[in-house]
Design a protein with these regions (language model features):
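N-terminal secretory signal peptides
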Residues: 1-14, 23-34, 40
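Extracellular glycan-binding segments that recognize GlcNAc-based cell-wall polysaccharides
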Residues: 16, 316-628
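Functionally critical loop-and-helix segments that line ligand-binding/catalytic clefts
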Residues: 41-113, 124, 265-319
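Substrate-binding cleft of extracellular glycoside hydrolase catalytic domains
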Residues: 91, 96-235, 415-418, 423
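Structural recognition of the beta-strand scaffold that forms the well-ordered cores
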Residues: 105-108, 128-133, 161-166, 199-205, ...
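Solvent-exposed loop/turn segments at secondary-structure junctions
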Residues: 111-115, 135-140, 168-174, 207-211, ...
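Loop/turn elements at helix/coil->beta-strand transitions in domains of secreted/extracellular proteins
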Residues: 125-130, 158-163, 192-200, 243-250, ...
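Catalytic domains of cell-wall/extracellular-matrix polysaccharide-remodeling enzymes
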Residues: 194-283
Length: 628
């Protein structure tokens, strides 16, 4: 995934106890500096104190071990519960009964555990992930967790996937944003980025007043009661701040809080971590991780530690994994590295427009090679490195010197790729025809594809089929959405037996069917839906009927084209489909993936959480695991 060694295409999701984790094409050009500049400005006003922690877990900053009550939704385990696996490989509770749906087991840790021997933890095989406390309250250095950096380094050095949590004192949205900046400051200081975390950044909500109701601590150290709406606003302020930088966000609370105070459906767009020390979690709402006990024993960790179960496989890539990088070109490189260890040929297209890369899908299919993106003026660093890594000796550059400068040809040769072939026409339709001619001469395909040139979504969805079937894509003219005389002539010369039109009559003129029949094509089929997102699902459904698979399929954003341009080639090579989504239209997940989830043993999400949001990622994982 362009990602950390642990997480593949991160996902983020979980929170924590003591106080209280998938970029690209727009993939996620993550501009760290503006927000980090804020995070670096440590507040020096009034500061809270760890002794102000009061909750079902803390009494004036001290951990409470045995005094939880049933009213809190907590029933404590006996000391030393094992939580191991049974003979069938199922995670079990303290009574040895399987925990339905539990995929991964982890711990959450803070300075309360002292210095942890992470190598011993790793070698014990006791856990799959860790959630690390970074601190508590607003952005003050004396509220940093004393073991945060040691714990991060221990996880990094030993390949343990991890996420972050912060114990909240916030009683206002401004304080919540300060708490988010507290997290961001420490992540930046630790040298971490959204690519580093396998799990989300969690807000730990448990601070309460003497009556047991939710509260915050103001800058005078006073306890302030919080209404349900205030809690929702505080949570949104914190989560939106960390999400703006590209991190996934989550919320931690016990069942009492989730049932009575954190009740709105808006919380479902973040990873939900539920604490209930019981043999089962009885919370009836959606949740992704369960904190089952505070009394587990793990080799390498002195004393008791919280044990948690991940039901989505967020850090373990159980089915879906993200492929992404710091920006769209990093994502493109990661996609190429995922699909190819070597390739004698590459196709290079500009990242500045989508037509050339899309219509090059069949050409890439002919040569079983990746599609690489570059800037127009010079060869991108990422494409340069991947050409060298793959050992390519031939590069097809699609697009003329306006699309990609002539100097790029020589830059490609300097990578060791000695043969550069330019394929282009006078405009995007002409380049599509030139590419199609190459494909026809090499493979004599029996099918061609017709798409609009004024938007990219329809052709994105059919690109894997074009690669797999080696079916050329022809573009309609701008404005009219009709086929030009030159394109009709090229189609007729292709000798196709069938043609596929992607998009409705607004995208591709209703008269195009007749024009294709006049070109001698006996079978013409149009595929479309109400919007481009329904069209995407319809195309994928049709592709499966043609023999393509949903296993190893991919999901990408429909807001931009970068990730799917490169990803379409990977899907085509795998013989799998690609669907697109956006936050306001997840038809691809709900209508296409959901009924086919049993057929999917692995799948990809192209792009990080700025491209395919954390909410969409959670919806996908919850759909796959039946937890929605």
């Amino acid at each position: 995934m362009s990602q950390t060694p642990f997480q593949r295409f991160p996902s983020r999701c979980i929170a924590r106890r003591d106080a209280v984790k998938i970029i690209a094409g727009a993939s996620a050009a993550i501009a760290l500096s503006p927000s980090m500049a804020l995070a670096d400005s440590i507040e020096e006003d009034a500061q809270a104190d760890q002794t102000l922690m009061n909750s079902w877990r803390y009494d004036q900053g001290e951990l409470i071990e045995d005094e939880a009550t049933e009213e809190d939704g907590i029933s404590t385990y006996g000391s030393g519960s094992a939580f191991g696996k049974d003979a069938e490989g199922n995670w079990c509770n303290s009574q040895g009964n399987p925990i339905p749906g539990a995929l991964l087991r982890g711990v959450d840790v803070s300075e309360h555990q002292g210095v942890i021997d992470w190598r011993t933890v790793k070698n014990s095989g006791s856990i799959d992930y860790a959630i690390i406390r970074c601190g508590f309250g607003s952005n003050y250095s004396n509220q940093d967790d004393k073991q945060f950096f040691n714990n991060v380094r221990g996880c990094l050095d030993n390949g343990i996937p991890f996420g972050i949590y912060l114990y909240s004192y916030a009683c206002s949205t401004s304080m919540a944003r300060s708490e988010a900046q507290h997290v961001l400051r420490l992540l930046d200081k630790a040298g971490l980025s959204p690519l580093s975390l396998n799990y989300p950044v969690y807000l730990d909500l448990e601070q309460q007043d003497k009556s047991g109701k939710p509260s915050g601590i103001n800058d005078k150290g006073q306890s302030i009661a919080l209404s349900n709406s205030a809690l929702a606003d505080i949570t949104a302020a914190f989560c939106s701040t960390v999400e703006a930088i590209g991190y996934a966000a989550g919320v931690y609370a016990n069942t009492n809080w989730w049932t009575n105070f954190l009740t709105g459906s808006t919380y479902n767009k973040w990873s939900k971590w539920v604490a209930q020390y019981n043999t089962v979690c009885t919370y009836s709402g959606i949740y992704d991780m369960w904190q089952a006990s505070s009394k587990a024993q793990v080799p390498g960790i002195g004393g008791n530690v919280d044990i948690n179960f991940d039901f989505l496989g967020i850090g373990g890539n159980h089915v879906w994994s993200r492929i992404f990088g710091q920006d769209q070109l990093d994502t493109m490189r990661s996609i190429a590295q995922t699909g190819w260890s070597s390739s004698s040929t590459v196709v290079v297209a500009t990242q500045n427009t989508y037509w050339d890369a899309l219509t090059a899908s069949a050409l890439a299919g002919i040569h079983d090679c990746p599609i690489l993106l570059t800037s127009s003026s010079s060869l991108s660093t990422q494409t340069k490195s991947i050409i060298s890594q793959l050992g390519a000796t031939t590069a097809y550059v699609v697009g003329g010197p306006i699309a990609i400068a002539s100097a790029v040809d020589e830059q490609i040769k300097n990578t060791g790729c000695g043969k550069v072939i330019r394929v282009y026409g006078d405009d995007q339709q002409g380049t599509a025809r030139a590419i199609a001619e190459q494909v026809v001469n090499a493979a004599a395909p029996d099918t061609c594809i017709i798409a609009t040139s004024w938007k990219f979504q329809d052709a994105l969805s059919v690109a894997p089929y074009a690669y797999w079937k080696k079916a050329p894509i022809y573009l309609c003219d701008d404005g009219s959405n009709k086929l030009s005389a030159e394109t009709e002539k090229a189609i007729k010369a292709g000798g196709y037996k069938s043609a596929i039109i992607v998009g409705g009559p607004i995208a591709v003129d209703s008269g195009v069917e007749a024009r294709l029949e006049n070109c001698g094509i006996p079978s013409v089929k149009r595929i479309y839906g109400e919007t481009e997102y329904e069209t995407s699902a319809a195309i994928a459904d049709w592709e499966t009927k043609c023999g393509m698979s949903v296993n190893k399929m991919a999901l990408a954003t429909g807001n931009t084209y970068y990730d799917a341009l490169a990803g379409g080639a990977l899907c085509g090579r795998n013989g799998s489909v690609l669907v697109i989504e956006k936050n306001s239209n997840r038809t691809a997940i709900t209508n296409f993936i959901a009924p086919r989830k049993s057929e999917i043993s692995s799948g990809y999400v192209f792009g990080g959480p700025i491209a395919v949001s954390s909410e969409s990622w959670l919806t996908l994982l919850r759909t796959q695991t039946g937890r929605i």
